[in-house]
From Swiss-Prot:
Subcellular location: Nucleus
Protein name: Splicing factor ESS-2
Low complexity bias (residue ranges): 125-136, 464-477
Matching InterPro entries: Nuclear_protein_DGCR14_ESS-2 (IPR019148)
The family this protein is said to belong to: Belongs to the ESS2 family.
Amino acid sequence: MSSFDKNDERAQLMVPKSINEGKVVKLSQKTLVTKKIERQVVPEEKYIAGLDKIIEKDYFPHLKKMQAQKEYLEAVANKDINKIKELQMKFCSTGSVRTDRSFRTPITTRSTTEAPDVSSFDADTPGPSSASTSSAHDWMQSPMPFANEEGDNEALNRKRKKKKEETLTSYLNKYTSEDNASFEELAKVMREREDARRPWVYKAEEEHNKNLVTRQAIAAEADVQLALKHAVDADDNRPLNVDNWAYKAWNTVLFNPDGAALTPAEIADAARKQQTEINKRGTRFPDSGKLKPSDEAMTRAAVSHALANAGKVDFLGNEVTPANSFKLLETPNPNPDDMDSPLMTWGEIDGTPFRLDAPDVTEHSLPGAAPVFKIPEVPYREKIAQSMNDSIAAKYRDKRKVAMRAAEGAHFSRTPGFGSKRVSDKLAQLSPAAQKLATKKLGLKMLPAHKSPFASPKIMSNWSRPSSSKRSTTPGSAWSRGSTTPGSSWSQGAQTPGTPGIESMIRRKGDNVGPSTSAGAADRANAGDFF
């Protein structure tokens, strides 16, 4: 029997199949696990101070210079001479001390065997010559510049390692504050509490996703699909779950979705964007704007120079023009005591020299700056005149207010009291019902004009009252309730003299109504006055 026949027999035998046979396992994408960055926890004050130092160094290098100028201007305003001297000595370089030439000394202290550096002195300052120095110098006692302490020549190849300056990103990756560290610890504790409170949720998710096997056909690998087909009589032992369905505890139905997975191109783009690049030039003006004046400023300077030299001649009698108009300049002296020059310093801040009492950048010096209108300050004389004018105007306003109050008090008097002529006229014009109401409720006694019971009541007046009346006739008491006190109002039957009553207004029988009436009859009211 050949080997081929044996193989055919073996193929006809039923071999038990495993559970996972016929299943396609889809491997997940490999994930790169990186080491967690451990930051050093520092106090809050130290952390903030380090951030301030790096930000000032990298993004605002001119801040130190501006702070010095601010301190100087405040010292000048407060007339603090000690502070001014301190700032001058602080920002004055060691090579240019503002002292007399005769008192200038070398800055650094040298040994007796070492020759002083001639370059540290000024050109006009006499110093030791090189010949005398070389004759007195002992070369055996001086260290060799080409050898180290042991005498080897290895020192020539050794270079001091330059200290790497720390950037803002490296500082944030290396250090963290106590507040940030405590917050991360609290967040970690909360996550652990959540896992301990609902372990069944996260455990079920982990078990399901670990045993998940996808059985979806892969169209790109058709030959693999044909090789992994199940036999017709084989049992289907597949788990009763949906194909390609991963379980997640925080599902997208009840919670916000995390979003679709990123493609390789998007991952590469995100990694490239994580490399932060800070434009430090955007935090300051360019130096060319401070040093180079604008074209408008140069044009204005040329025009003003030409107008100032118009009609002038030089020592040869030629007219001075802008082309050949040069001035004689004096040799600058760094000592401000000799010349009235502005206080300057030769420092190591930004530029040498710079003025402490004036800004470096002006609005007119910037390129493309437009002309600026500036209102001059009010002169001191104008301020005094304005204050005097305001004080005089305030006095006049006070006098006017006092006069207006006096006029208002005289014009707007009190409400007329009862018993006056105007009130009596109004009461006389009332209806009988109103007069009855005044009699009962207000206590006014209304006397009838005639004996007839149907006659209209009347208010007694001083003119019609008989002389034998026992009621009060005190002047000034009107419509009083039987009171005889002078000045009391609402007296019963008492009226101020001169007040007309109803009796004088009613026409009696037999009165003469013709044109030849008397003076008393002419003052009586007509019937038409009541309608």
